[in-house]
Amino acid sequence: MSDTILQIKNLNVEFPVFGGIFQHEVSQVHAVNNVNLDIMSGKTIGIVGESGSGKSTLGKAIINVLKLTAPDVRVYGDIILYPQTDDAINVLHIKPSQVKSYRSDVQMIFQDPYSSLNPRMLVGDIIKEPLDINTSSSTVEKQDRVAWLLNKVGLNKEQANRYPHEFSGGQKQRIAIARALATNPKVVIADEPVSALDVSIQAQVINLMMDLQEEFNLTILFIAHDLSVVKHISTEIAVMYLGEVVEYGDTEKVFSDPQHDYTKTLLESIPHPDPVGREERKEERLKLERFSM
C-alpha cells in the first residue's frame, strides 16, 4: 500500500431516469459499475473505451464534481487518496477540513480548452485562481508561481496579461495544464486532453505532459479513446466497457496479449496506413460497432 497514491474500491455511479406524469424514478443508468483500481504513485494510467463506456464519469467521480451538473446522481464505494504526508482522504466521505487539501492534491485537465478557460479572465488570473482558493501564498509568490508555470509549459510570463482568445488551441491546453499544476498536485486527471487538437499539436502536448510527469513525479489518469496516444504515454491501461473495467495491466502486455474480447476488438480496429488488409480491419471496426449495440 506504501506506493499506492489512489485506491478505488467497488465504485458505482448511477444516474436516475425519471418518467411518468409525476416524474418518478423509473430506472437507473449504471455509468460506472463496481470499478476497482489500485493506482501507483508516479505512474500514468490510460483509461480507454468508446463513448459511453464510463471513463469520463469515472474521472469526474474521482475529482468529485458529478453533483455540480447532476445533483441526483448516486455515487457509492470508496475513492481513497493516500497523500503520504497526511491522513488518507476518502473523497466520498470527505471531511470539511480535508476539502482544500484534496483539491490541491487532485486536479483535472478538461477536454476542450475553448470552454474550460474563462474568456473574461486574464491567463495569469486563470492560472492563479487555484492558488487564491487553496493556498495562503502572498501576491508576489503567486505571481512568481504563475510566471514559472508558464515557462514550464512552453509559454512566457508576458503572456499572463493576455486573454484566452488570443491563443491557439494548443496554447490554450498548455494554459490548462499550467492551471492544473498550480497547486503542485499529486494526481492529475486528463480527460481527453488532446482530442480537440490537430494531430501535430497533439504530439507536442503529449510530449509536454510526459516531461512534466517525469519532472514532478506526477500520477496521471489519462482518459482517451485514441489507443495510439494511450500506448505512447501510459505505463498501464484500464479498458472500460459499459461502466466496467474489463481489463487492466501493463501497457505493453495489454497491447501484445489482450485477454478480453472487447480489448481485442478495440486493438484490431486501430486505423493503419498500410492498405494491405484494409478489408479485414474494416470488418473489425464493424465488429466493434456490433459489440457496442
Per-segment meaning from a language model:
Residues 230-232:
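A short, surface-exposed alpha-helical micro-motif characterized by mixed small hydrophobic
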Residues 163-167, 171:
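Conserved ABC ATPase signature
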Residues 82-87, 140-158, 267-268:
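Conserved ABC ATPase "signature" region
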Residues 182-186:
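A short, proline-enriched helix->beta-strand linker immediately N-terminal to the Walker B motif
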Residues 2-4, 17-23, 88, 250-293:
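Short catalytic/signature loops enriched in Gly
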Residues 78-101:
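ABC ATPase NBD Q-loop/coupling interface
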